[in-house]
Swiss-Prot record:
GO terms for cellular component: chloroplast; DNA-directed RNA polymerase complex; mitochondrion. The keyword Transcription applies. Signal peptide: none annotated. Belongs to the RNA polymerase alpha chain family. This is DNA-directed RNA polymerase subunit alpha.
Amino acid sequence: MVREKVRVSTRTLQWKCVESRVDSKRLYYGRFILSPLMKGQADTIGIAMRRALLGEIEGTCITRAKFEKIPHEYSTIVGIQESVHEILMNLKEIVLRSNLYGTCNASICVKGPGCVTAQDILLPPSVEIIDNTQHIASLMEPIHLCIGLQIERNRGYHIKSPNNFQDGSYPIDAVFMPVRNANHSIHSYGNQNEKQEILFLEIWTNGSLTPKEALHEASRNLIDLFLPFLHAEEENLHLGKNKYNVTFPLFTFHKKLAKLRKPKNEIALKSIFIDQLELPPRIYNSLKGSKIHTLSDLLNKSQEDLMKMKHFRIEDVKQILDILEIEKAFHNRFNEENVENAFISSFFLNKTKGQKKDEMGFESLE
């Protein structure tokens, strides 16, 4: 039997932004191309990227508003042109950008007469408003308007529950999608035997992300989704009696650093804060949210403990391991005692560097 040769492209894939514009503060547009692709690949990538752009990217929204002494959502407030419902709809349209983890609070407290806009919202430092001119309400009389707000970072679309009213606060339908729309098209070229394709990808965003940032984040999310399949063999994943239960490997550096938790080093480890590890914001926030503040706290956790934390994945364990450079320490020519001392000394050196920076006027540690 004669096997047909499978033709594999040896050309390097390249992508380029061919058009970029800002139509308004809340509407950005970008057009990108990826080539050369073999027949069928453009559609595969285009469909996956569009779904990731529209459904996998996180955004920040106002999800709840609290008014004082308002009986129901369709009430009117004396001296305010809009009803409570209209104010809630205006708050829903506010576009925010943040590196927030979870939820936080904000507020509006103004005195009329005058127009209340997005710039009147008092926000935490981690959140910023894209368009300060967005309208919220019109105060026709010299009255005070105070609204408590809840801000959340999430993804997708959350519809408010009709029964989710808590002591004068009202839920708001939240659209966490920074990407307003995404389209892909395909251009084929070449002869019948060596047909190749160019993928065109169009992205519209609400201004909280640029199209290029959205493309980058969607790509990273897709990579994260496929990583378990890539590392299935090296991770030695196996199924137990319940075919849906997956047993993960042991926490790699938990055993190797057992000696670092000896009494003589415990004080040193408690003096090394995770702020000094230069962790990615998502991993750092996840550890902080679980009250892990020092290297000692981290090393006293098993992998099972870490995997129970919200948004924590097996790849994050690997990333922590890389940052700590444990593998490098355990494969060099030093003995175990020297490794321990070198490991701890390196962190105190970083700490000292950070203190010097503070003396020079910088706020953050290295």
